[in-house]
Amino acid sequence: MTEEIRELIEKFALQNAVKYRSAPNHGAVMGKLMGERPDLRPRAREIAPLITSVLNEIERMSPEQWESRLREMAPELIEEISARKEPAKGLQPLEGAEGGVVMRFAPNPNGPPTLGSARGIIINSEYVKMYGGKFILRFDDTDPVNKRPMIEAYDWYIEDCKWLGAEPHEIVAASQRVEKYYEVAEELIRRGGAYVCLCEQTAFKALKDAAMPCPHRDQTVDENMALWNKMLDGSFQEGEAVLRVKTDIKHKDPAMRDWAGFRIVTKSHPLVGERYRVWPLLDFESAVEDHLLGVTHILRGKDLIDSERRQRYLYDHMGWVYPRVLHWGRVKIFQFGAFSTSKLRKAIEAGEYSGWDDPRLPTVRAMRRRGITAEALRKFMIDLGVGETDISISMDSIYAENRRIVDPIANRRFFVWDPVEIEIKGEVPEVAEAPLHPTIDRGTRRIRAGGRLLLCKEDVAGLAPGSRIRLKDLCNIEIKEIFPLRAELIDLSPETAKRLKLRIIHWAPVEGIPVRVLGPDKTDTGIGEHGISDELDRIVQFERYGFVRIDSVGEEVVAYFAHR
């Protein structure tokens, strides 16, 4: 009975692994088993350790071995995966897009692009590719205090846009166009749509909350223009004057009432220094830029609906037509939780992270350094589409997409972490010939071998005197002693391993190259085959470990972990 259950578990686990091209999920396997065999539900506690045992074995296999084993055990489950229809994915048509669109991605450059930024970059640029037109990268960088720009981040955004396949047709920095906002502000004053408010902040808030106008609201155009010029010439200090956009002072939402469009900031700006002392707030700057740049469609978070409502007052005053707007919900990534660029910046400055490309961070730079491809991010974000529902996703989904892309092109290499030396009695070949790829003929690699090799400590833990195993692409051995670890050669034949159903483990030469793998959760050190040093800046698969990108080669190889 136990053997029958074990076989069912193995089939369902392999199906889960093949479907998602990642290590099988314990909960999914348990759910499938209980769904197919409800009679086993009372035994769930007893079965759980059995599932864990089977999953541990499957995790040691390659994706190619998963599929081969599943075809052998249950080909109908392969067909079930193939036949299952995928839900509709991709970008839905844009209304009013015929004839071309102008779309923008408008970050504050206070840090490099994150995965959230990548979504905006990719989706906006993809719509431009669909309909023709212009994709604009606009830096909304007019807050030198609360969201102070990083001078390096401007170039980082441009680099990452290009890497993501979204090279902008035009690049604009709002901080270099402040005179244009001054022109609009003055026209707005002339039209009676704005006034200079001299109220203290607390006094204005009390009036606003009571839906009462401040005493400056009814100033004449000339009075407002004179006060505006005093803001510009330095007569007022920070906090003494703001330019407000007239709205409905009785609006049911206090946030809509006479919002601030400009304020005085004397702090130097990283890009333009002290050229300006009166800066537009984001709602004003963004609204004006969308008009000046001829933006036709805006993608923005549904949490910014209030910004749109405020901006429409400005558009109405100026007689402009507001662009079409699509709202989307938040995307939360399990592995990273809630994060903000400003908090990450402080953590980096405090030494908690090595930099913006630290493998633990959700930045595009970190993804690239780990070996996550631009193609995988594009495909994933496009499939995610545009919808108002908040969604939670796992990095496993991005990893699965990346695995599909890199698996055919990644050479295979041996890396032994936590190495333990084994001495083998017999004529073990001095050099092993192993394929660079298990299913695509790209030739072979030569690996130093001989009678002294290294095995992973976790593999050794499962051995005992009398255990028989196959060292991948080398030979079959029988363990004779554990302390010290010694074995005897059986033969070299893969057929023997098949006939005896030997467990297959990888190995590394004793005189191999030191390797350090940096990952989101841990750092592993060990020894790898010398050929790893030929893979600089490439994505490879360390067999039975996972996909990595080789970051540097010297006295040791430094690799960044991508995923299994």
Curated annotation (Swiss-Prot):
Q: Where in the cell is it found?
A: Cytoplasm
Quick one: where is this thing mainly located?
cytoplasm
Q: Listed disulfide bonds for this chain?
A: none
| Keyword Protein biosynthesis among UniProt keywords | yes
Function of the protein: Catalyzes the attachment of glutamate to tRNA(Glu) in a two-step reaction: glutamate is first activated by ATP to form Glu-AMP and then transferred to the acceptor end of tRNA(Glu).
Family the entry assigns = Belongs to the class-I aminoacyl-tRNA synthetase family. Glutamate--tRNA ligase type 2 subfamily.
Q: What is this protein called?
A: Glutamate--tRNA ligase
Q: Which organism is it from?
A: Methanothrix thermoacetophila (strain DSM 6194 / JCM 14653 / NBRC 101360 / PT) (Methanosaeta thermophila)
What is the phylogenetic placement of the source species in the record?
Archaea, Methanobacteriati, Methanobacteriota, Stenosarchaea group, Methanomicrobia
